[in-house]
């Protein structure tokens, strides 16, 4: 009973806070209008003029307009429509903030729209957008600290949701591409795993040293060795698990750590650069298996997984190093 009361109070406070955030931000948007009036159109143009002047790094996302000045933005009809689009998005995000389900769904739709238009904007750029937007509003009206904080809160939740959406999208693209390297007991499925090692031994011969007793193998030797049937299945299964868990960040990170621990247990100590290099190898192999039919979105998705895998592997290596150094110091005390 007590826990139910506490939960109800927490929920009430959260809803009240979201409603207050919405109220403050909606009030400030009176100075960044949407509509067909001349004033509203100019508000949208002014947002992009401010962006192009103070955040020039964002210009590269506007093809053929990368070298625009604020004066160029003012004269280009493109920014009349685009300005209203971006202000409308800000209005909707603000208006739905106290309805989290709708807010999250709208963020997802915005991300999907950018994907359909082949506009790839890194998450950190989205984060910077909210700094820019708050500065822009501050140039149109006086923003008090509670209002600035309210917009920062919306920006933070927006960033959280795009991170969640982004991981879903990466997972979906990678899962689609795995049709080219199915795993199982059929001969062609076993061959998929063997082919990965054949590619490795042919094009990345320095990686052979991790395979004791097989350091001088050719790709023909790999084909004939039953070891690579089992090993090929293992590595393709691991890749599938990394892909399927990618939208669950804690599970993905834990699985990477488990893979690192397994290699250490088996006395396989790969240089960190080889973990990074593996993803280049895998991209080549997968593109070859797809007969060069991988989409750019699929290639980008695997690159993203590779970067996050390598980042987590680096963290694991540092933790291991710190642990061993700590043990070494204790031995000498």
Swiss-Prot record:
Keyword match Repeat: yes
Keywords for the protein's UniProt record, in alphabetical order: Glycoprotein, Heme, Iron, Metal-binding, Oxygen transport, Repeat, Secreted, Signal, Transport
Cell compartment(s), UniProt: Secreted, Extracellular space
GO molecular-function term, one example from the UniProt record: oxygen binding
One of the record's GO cellular component terms: extracellular region
Signal peptide: 1-18
Record's keyword annotation contains Secreted: yes
Boundaries of every Globin domain copy: 25-167, 174-318
Binding annotation for heme b: 82, 114, 231, 263
Comment, domains: Consist of two tandemly linked globin-like sequences which probably each bind a heme group and a C-terminal extension which may act as a cement between the eight subunits.
Protein name, UniProt field: Extracellular globin
Organism: Pseudoterranova decipiens (Sealworm)
């Amino acid at each position: 009973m007590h826990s139910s009361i506490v939960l109800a109070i927490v929920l009430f406070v959260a809803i009240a806070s979201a409603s207050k955030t919405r109220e403050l931000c909606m009030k400030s948007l009176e100075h960044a209008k949407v509509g067909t009036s001349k004033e509203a159109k100019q508000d949208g143009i002014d947002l992009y003029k401010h962006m192009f002047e103070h955040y020039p790094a964002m210009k590269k996302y506007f093809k053929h307009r990368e070298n625009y000045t604020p004066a160029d933005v003012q004269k280009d009809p493109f920014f009349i429509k685009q300005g209203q689009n971006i202000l409308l998005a800000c209005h909707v995000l603000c208006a739905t903030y106290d309805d989290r389900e709708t807010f999250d769904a709208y963020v997802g739709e915005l991300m999907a729209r950018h994907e359909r238009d082949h506009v790839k904007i890194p998450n950190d750029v989205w984060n910077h957008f909210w700094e820019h937007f708050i500065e822009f509003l501050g140039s149109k009206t006086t923003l008090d600290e509670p209002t600035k904080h309210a917009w920062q809160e919306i920006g933070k939740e927006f960033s959280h949701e795009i991170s969640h959406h982004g991981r879903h999208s990466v997972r979906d693209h990678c899962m689609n591409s795995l049709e080219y390297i199915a795993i199982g007991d059929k001969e062609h499925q076993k061959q998929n795993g063997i082919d990965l090692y054949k590619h490795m031994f042919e094009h990345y011969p320095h990686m052979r040293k991790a395979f004791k007793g097989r350091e001088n193998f050719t790709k023909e030797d790999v084909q004939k060795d039953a070891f690579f049937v089992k090993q090929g299945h293992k590595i393709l299964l691991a890749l599938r698990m990394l892909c399927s868990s990618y939208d669950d960040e804690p599970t993905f990170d834990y699985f990477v750590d488990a893979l690192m621990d397994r290699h250490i247990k088996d006395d396989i100590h790969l240089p960190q650069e080889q973990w990074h290099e593996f993803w280049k190898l895998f991209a080549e192999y997968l593109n070859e298996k797809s007969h060069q039919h991988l989409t750019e979105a699929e290639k980008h998705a695997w690159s993203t997984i590779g970067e996050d895998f390598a980042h987590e592997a680096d963290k694991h290596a540092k933790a291991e190093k710190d642990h061993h150094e700590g043990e070494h110091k204790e031995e000498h005390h």
